[in-house]
């Protein structure tokens, strides 16, 4: 049994919104990013419709109570450990690249004490599978250079760096992968 065997991945539900917002803010702060600096959070407040209606998906990863600790946001009898989604690139924010026929990963988060255990990799594999099933053949991702773990995560998962840009005080790193 591997550490991620207890992870259950499923589509996000409206009832998950508060837990997703809590995880999002926690993970950003731990990575050195002020959540107020990240463009909008309207997509999270309007889950799951904000992803589904745009042609994407938002997925949550939960652990049963016995496999989790009380630092994780509660979701009924389970706890939220990971979350993330994808949308067509033309459904993103002004500062993001629009690549015809591609989807962009958004809000990839793993609870800080659980990072480095394979949960992010499992979530990413699920999102890649769902994006491919939805007809996308290219996934793009953008992260702040100061989020070192994310900058290392994407190349380790087969993404290649395709450029850098600036948004406010943040240097952004752009990745893509054919799926």
Residue ranges, per PLM feature:
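C-terminal "cap" of GNAT-fold acetyltransferases
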Residues: 3-7, 26, 45, 101, ...
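Conserved glycine-rich acetyl-CoA-binding loop
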Residues: 107-125, 132-134, 139, 145-152, ...
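Acetyl-CoA-dependent GNAT
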Residues: 3, 7, 11-112, 124-125, ...
